[in-house]
Amino acid sequence: MPVQGSQRRLLGSLNSTPTATPRLGLAANQTGARCLEVSIPDGLFLSLGLVSLVENVLVVVAIARNRNLHSPMYCFICCLALSDLLVSGSNMLETAVILLLEAGALAARAAVVQQLDNVIDVITCSSMLSSLCFLGAIAVDRYISIFYALRYHSIVTLRRARRVVAAIWVASVLFSTLFIAYCDHAAVLLSLVVFFLAMLVLMAVLYVHMLARACQHAQGIAQLHKRQRPAHQGVGLKGAATLTILLGIFFLCWGPFFLHLTLIVLCPQHPTCSCIFKNFNLFLTLIICNAIIDPLIYAFRSQELRRTLKKVLLCSW
């Protein structure tokens, strides 16, 4: 991933020896000041990655097995699961290689490790970009289904959805390759941050607009049935809570990583920023957690998908 040179983890592990580190402790930065560092045990990181891997594989298999789920909406959900699967898998692979190098179980030249590091970084970066894009695509799809309900099936066709999916994957791989090749340039890191903020604003605007429409719809129904205002307020509160959870999880899981990239550009040598840089693995762990949560929000809430998943699991036994 595009981080500071000292944090290129695979290359650093060639000449490193494993050291015991606490999960939470005070570490000294370059100026000798004390700062909070959260160390994520490799076992915990790999376990979270495995949970995410299994979850998202199940989503992909369930959607692929059920032809009723071969719709544009589930196409985006399936691709989101595939992106999250690659995010988890690439980070697990990197961690496993690091552990093997540190244990001496894997012997490799620096040039080979450099190439492997670049490949893993491209996979990780492209899957992160595609994951953000598919979250935005799902928001746009839901927006069209609400505000253009009568024209939805003519606007969002499976053919167009597949074109969007192909464009997202191609663009993600292309731009991630450029990002990794020029990760030392401030403009590259800032463009990633701007892209994240654009996705955040897009999702917030669309979902807030959808919430407002839902409240208006509930108010109209309440007036038709001559109900009191609390019924309308209940819908608004429930929708606001759902929106807060959805956007809150997105910002909490992705925000720290992009804050990290921003600080690399703004204050690479500042003591406070150096303390934040020490928690890079924590920020990656939060992204893995997002990959675990995404299926719960976007996939497993579907009864049709849950039924298909149950059949798949029963057949596997």
UniProtKB/Swiss-Prot annotation:
Topological type in the membrane: Multi-pass membrane protein
Predominant localisation class: membrane
Disulphide bond pairs: none
Membrane-side (Cytoplasmic) residue stretches: 64-72, 141-163, 212-240, 301-317
Keyword Protease: no
Domain of life: Eukaryota
Keywords: Cell membrane, G-protein coupled receptor, Glycoprotein, Lipoprotein, Membrane, Palmitate, Receptor, Transducer, Transmembrane, Transmembrane helix
Topological domains, Extracellular: 1-37, 94-118, 184-191, 267-279
Molecular-function annotations in GO: melanocyte-stimulating hormone receptor activity
Location of this chain's protein in the cell: Cell membrane
Cell cycle listed as a keyword: no
Glycosylation sites: N29
GO cellular component, one term: plasma membrane
InterPro entries linked to this entry: GPCR_Rhodpsn, GPCR_Rhodpsn_7TM, Melcrt_ACTH_rcpt, MSH_rcpt
Lipidation (S-palmitoyl cysteine): C315
One Gene Ontology term from the biological process aspect of the record: adenylate cyclase-activating G protein-coupled receptor signaling pathway
Record-annotated membrane-spanning stretches: 38-63, 73-93, 119-140, 164-183, 192-211, 241-266, 280-300
Role description: Receptor for MSH (alpha, beta and gamma) and ACTH. The activity of this receptor is mediated by G proteins which activate adenylate cyclase. Mediates melanogenesis, the production of eumelanin (black/brown) and phaeomelanin (red/yellow), via regulation of cAMP signaling in melanocytes.
PANTHER family associated with the record: G-PROTEIN COUPLED RECEPTOR
Assembly, per entry: Interacts with MGRN1, but does not undergo MGRN1-mediated ubiquitination; this interaction competes with GNAS-binding and thus inhibits agonist-induced cAMP production. Interacts with OPN3; the interaction results in a decrease in MC1R-mediated cAMP signaling and ultimately a decrease in melanin production in melanocytes.
Family: Belongs to the G-protein coupled receptor 1 family.
Name of the molecule in the record: Melanocyte-stimulating hormone receptor
Source species: Trachypithecus cristatus (Silvered leaf-monkey)
Name of the gene this protein is made from: MC1R
